[in-house]
Amino acid sequence: MKFYRTLLLFFASSFAFANSDLMLLHTYNNQPIEGWVMSEKLDGVRGYWNGKQLLTRQGQRLSPPAYFIKDFPPFAIDGELFSERNHFEEISTITKSFKGDGWEKLKLYVFDVPDAEGNLFERLAKLKAHLLEHPTTYIEIIEQIPVKDKTHLYQFLAQVENLQGEGVVVRNPNAPYERKRSSQILKLKTARGEECTVIAHHKGKGQFENVMGALTCKNHRGEFKIGSGFNLNERENPPPIGSVITYKYRGITNSGKPRFATYWREKK
């Protein structure tokens, strides 16, 4: 009985904040962006500090070591746990661990202070003031760059993608923090991304003769194969049948299938 009580308490604490109601992004589709700001979209793990605990986007409590959060503020901040580009798997592994290993590689890159008053810059100023009194290497405020025009936006996107970044976030700095999917904060990527369910593996040929060559997956677009984007380890240990993966693509074929679909990562 004691074991089950302990287990119940563990799950209760892990999911106590299961509905964090964070601000989520819509997609940029040529909307007017005069007076807006932009920043790099970091490919990490969402981190929401509620003033006492660090939570995921789903509201699950993370287990950072004490040194990591020692100088975090007594108010909410929203950001992305991130180390460097193309390290999503490592970031994800670190944040899922209960041992606390590897957190020294991460920072919480903050893009908003949800409960502060004023526009975006005034909200972020509250965090800046706190950091002057309580400096920490584990919080960094993401630079917000004023957008001159759409040409400037796409030039910045090209710069980010040339550095292997995920994309760009463009937002209205005069809008409040909205705890929903908001039309005031938009994501922009050259390659679109979607999810699908793996339904089959196919043996490779040539250099991939002894590993997976491609897989078939299925979503609202139907069934289609994905054979590129995998590294050798992913071909040797492919996403299991029934798992959900994310793929990138560039447009739609006449038959409604994704064009140039490439594997990105397994959703976990």
From Swiss-Prot:
Catalyzes efficient strand joining on a single nicked DNA. Keywords: ATP-binding, DNA damage, DNA recombination, DNA repair, DNA replication, Ligase, Metal-binding, Nucleotide-binding. It catalyses: ATP + (deoxyribonucleotide)n-3'-hydroxyl + 5'-phospho-(deoxyribonucleotide)m = (deoxyribonucleotide)n+m + AMP + diphosphate. SUPFAM superfamilies: DNA ligase/mRNA capping enzyme, catalytic domain, Nucleic acid-binding proteins. Its EC number is 6.5.1.1. The active site is at K41 (n6-amp-lysine intermediate). ATP binds at F111, R181, K187. It comes from Haemophilus influenzae (strain ATCC 51907 / DSM 11121 / KW20 / Rd). This is DNA ligase. InterPro entries: DNA_ligase_ATP-dep_cent, DNA_ligase_ATP-dep_CS, DNA_ligase_OB, NA-bd_OB-fold, NAD_dep_DNA_ligaseB. GO terms for molecular function: ATP binding; DNA ligase (ATP) activity; DNA ligase (NAD+) activity; metal ion binding. The gene is ligA. It comes from the Bacteria. Belongs to the ATP-dependent DNA ligase family. Its cofactor is a divalent metal cation. Pfam families: DNA_ligase_A_M, DNA_ligase_OB_2. GO terms for biological process: DNA recombination; DNA repair; DNA replication.
